[in-house]
Regions:
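P-loop NTPase motor domains
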Residues: 1-19, 25, 69-72, 76-220
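Short coil/loop residues immediately preceding or within conserved phosphate-binding loops
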Residues: 31
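Hydrophobic anchor at the beta1->P-loop junction of P-loop NTPases
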Residues: 36
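Walker A (P-loop) phosphate-binding loop of P-loop NTPases
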Residues: 41
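Conserved lysine of the Walker
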Residues: 44
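Hydrophobic positions on the alpha1 helix immediately C-terminal to the Walker A/P-loop
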Residues: 47
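Post-Walker A helix-loop "phosphate-sensing" segment adjacent to the P-loop in P-loop NTPases
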Residues: 53-63, 78-81
Length: 220
């Protein structure tokens, strides 16, 4: 057994006896971290999904960070939500939180910073006020008009960092505008089974970092 109840799943040993597999020790309430390492095509994904299938006896939510659509059929079979982050098959994402709350404003402030500034780049009070004013402005709009292309109109026209935002904007035909500049938001993580395919942006840190920031904010 483990602290969740019944053992996770059965394996047959070489002597044909039963091996009761767990990711936890008895009485251990810590997370059952595991690492699977083996050559390509050896069955890592199959084993992981088998473990997940058995773990559903305990309930809870699961999030699959996927590559090359490896888990899509599994997520679809269990009636989960599977998102593909790809400009040719884009899940429309609007990162601006729907409700104007203190917590949502704090997230949006940090998120906008991540779109404009490098992680080790310091900003001064003037730059901070530019972001705060833009957040005030976008929340003054009707909820259907809250997107990045409209948010940028609340920055000062001569702000020295304004041009850095263009890459994210459809209004500027930005290279990464497909990622976040949308009126709609289809990035709904309320299903108990979520799969997200990151194949297209795994090597694009400029897009990947803010996407992960948004993802973990919504999970929490």
């Amino acid at each position: 057994q483990n602290h969740l109840g019944h053992y996770l799943m059965p394996f047959k040993k070489k002597d044909n006896n039963l091996y009761k597999f767990n990711l936890h020790s008895i009485g251990d309430n810590s997370k059952g971290h595991s690492l699977l390492i083996s050559p390509t095509g050896s069955g890592k994904t199959t084993l992981m999904l088998a473990i997940d299938a058995f773990s559903q006896q305990y309930g809870g939510r699961r999030y699959f960070f996927d590559r090359n659509l490896g888990m899509k059929n599994y997520v679809d079979t269990l009636k989960g939500h599977y998102f593909i982050i790809n400009p040719n098959h884009a899940t429309r994402i609007n990162p601006i939180p729907k409700y104007d709350t203190r917590g949502n404003r704090f997230f949006l402030y940090e998120f906008i910073k991540s779109l404009i500034f490098a992680t080790d780049e310091l900003i001064d009070e003037v730059d901070s006020e530019e972001i705060k004013n833009a957040i005030d402005g976008v929340y003054s709009l009707d909820i259907n008009n809250r997107n990045l292309s409209n948010l940028v109109t609340f920055f000062s026209y001569n702000w020295k960092y304004l041009n850095r935002f263009n890459i994210w904007l459809k209004s500027s035909d930005g290279l990464l505008s497909w990622v976040f500049d949308n009126n709609e938001d289809e990035f709904d993580l309320t299903n108990n089974i979520i799969g997200i395919d990151f194949t297209h942006i795994l090597n694009n840190k400029k897009a990947l970092l803010p996407l992960m920031q948004l993802l973990f904010f919504r999970i929490e």
